[in-house]
A protein has these predicted regions:
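Generic recognition of flexible, low-complexity loop/linker segments
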Residues: 1, 21-25, 64-68, 135-140, ...
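Flexible loop/turn segments at secondary-structure boundaries
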Residues: 1, 13-18, 41-46, 84-89, ...
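Carbohydrate-binding surface patches
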Residues: 134-172, 178
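Composition- and surface-driven signal marking solvent-exposed, interaction-prone regions
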Residues: 20-22, 48-57, 92-93, 97-99, ...
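Active-site-proximal beta-strand/loop segments in catalytic clefts of secreted hydrolases
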Residues: 8-12, 37-40, 80-83, 153, ...
């Protein structure tokens, strides 16, 4: 890195804060690289540490990450934290991976991190979204594979139908794959 590095503060806030601040890095000085030291959303609707990083929090983090990725020219590194917590022995919440003496499991935040880290482009693409919908999105292009990667976070409690059109400069003949992270409501 040939630019000065800046460390942003630890951002452990409510899901609402993350949804309202997806543009957090939009106005940063473009001459410096930023390390977003630690970030995590946690709901205040419960005091149970294990339940504080739930789907609501994970979707808010995904929305925030669209802004981080959109500003990849400035945000050089970003780190979810804290990473591990032993069930029943926590100092804080949220945590990405929970464990006890016999097993471990990833929180919804773990799956957001996995989806984002396994779907990276070489550079980001400009995109517009209709203002009628409050969805969070980022687009990138993978020069090695020729893939266009579109990430969309819909933190709302309802589905939204969206249309995607791609600029003529890309040859998009071929197949498309979709990964989703969503809540399943069981009816009893």
């Amino acid at each position: 890195i040939n630019s000065p590095m800046r460390l942003t503060s630890i951002i452990i806030m409510s899901p609402e804060w993350f949804l309202e601040n997806d543009d957090f890095y939009d106005d940063y000085d473009r001459s410096a690289k930023v390390f977003a030291g630690e970030y995590a959303a946690h709901t205040t609707r419960t005091t149970d540490p294990v339940k504080r990083n739930n789907l609501e929090s994970a979707l808010a983090e995904a929305a925030f990450l669209t802004g981080v990725e959109r500003n990849a020219d400035v945000v050089y590194l970003a780190s979810y934290a804290p990473l591990f917590a032993r069930i029943g022995y926590t100092q804080w919440a949220p945590d990405m991976i929970w464990y006890d003496g016999a097993s471990s499991y990833g929180s919804p935040s773990y799956y957001v991190q996995s989806m984002y880290s396994n779907n990276n482009g070489t550079y980001t693409l400009e995109a517009d979204a209709e203002k009628d919908y409050k969805i969070y999105h980022t687009q990138s292009y993978d020069a090695k594979t020729g893939d266009i990667i579109i990430k969309i976070a819909n933190p709302h409690e309802y589905e939204q139908r969206i249309g995607i059109s791609v600029d003529d400069s890309f040859d998009i003949a071929g197949q498309m794959s979709v990964e989703t992270l969503r809540a399943i409501v069981l009816m009893m």
